[in-house]
Amino acid sequence: MSYERQNIRSLDGYSSGEQPIDDKVIKLNTNENPYPPAPGVQEVISGFDGSKLRRYPPPTADEFRNLAAKIHGVNKNQIIATRGGDELLRLLLTTFVDPLDPIGTTSPTYSLYPVLAQIQNCPVVEVELEDDWSLPTDFATRMNAAGVKLTLVVNPHAPTGKLFSKAQVRDLAETLDSVLLIDEAYIDFVDPDLNHDCLSMINEFDNLVFLRTLSKGYSLAGLRFGYGIGTESLIKPMLEKTRDSYNLDLLSQ
C-alpha cells in the first residue's frame, strides 16, 4: 500500500549529478566551478570553534544579511538567506502558489523547476525560446493569459548562456501579473563592463525577486548557501512564515 500523495507517486524526482569518488575525473555534469574557493574560506573553516556546534545557529542569518545588504546597496529586510538557491525556489512556490495554480518558465530551463512544481501539484506553462535562444517578445503576455502565479527566468540563461537585457527584465517585471523570480545563479560570470546589475529594480516593482548563490562563482557548492533579494513584501512572509526554523547551519553562516 502506498501512502504517497497521488502527484508524488507519479513524480520521477530530480536527478542529481553523480559525484564520482575519483578526483581525477573531469566533472562537468552539474556546472561546479573547477577552481577552489578563495584561500580565506579554508582559513575560516580551519579556525572554526567546534564547541559552538552545541547551539542552534542564528535563525535568520542576520550577520550575513547585513553584510549582503551593504554590498548590494539594499535593505537587510530585502534579503533572505537560504540553503542554496534551491531552497529559495521551494519557498517561492510554497509561499505564493496554491496547488493547481500554474507556474511559468521558458523552454529549455533549469530542470528542477518542473519537479518542484509537481511536488506542489502545480502545472507548468512553458514558452519556447526563439531559435537564437532569445526571449519571445510576447512571453509575459502569454504568462498572464495562462494565469501564471510565479514566473521563473534564469538569467544568464541556463543551459544556453544567453543574457537577457536589463530592459527585458524591467519589461517582465512591469508586465507580468505574477511574482517574478530572476534566477541569477550564473550572474558572477557576466562581464562587469556590461553594467547589467538589475537589483535596484526591487525598489520599483513589488513582484520581483532575484536569486543568488555562492555555489557557482564562489566555488562553494558544498556549503549549500544562497540568498534572495527582493521587495520586502515578498521577502517577509518567506523569512517569517515558510522558512525552516534553522535553515542554515552555523559553519556556512
Region roles according to the model:
Residues T95-V153:
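PLP-dependent aminotransferase-like
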Residues D62-P102, Q120:
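Phosphate-binding glycine-rich loop
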Residues G84-P99, L180-I182, Y186-D191, M201:
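Glycine/small-residue-rich loop that forms an oxyanion/phosphate-binding "nest" at active or ligand-binding sites
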Residues M1-R55, G147:
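N-terminal "arm"/small-domain region of PLP-dependent enzymes with the aminotransferase-like
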Residues N207-Q253:
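PLP-dependent aminotransferase class I/II
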Residues D131-V190:
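Active-site phosphate-binding strand-loop segment of PLP-dependent enzymes
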Residues D101, C122, L176-V179, D183-E184, ...:
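A short helix->loop->beta-strand "cap" motif at the edges of active sites that frequently abuts
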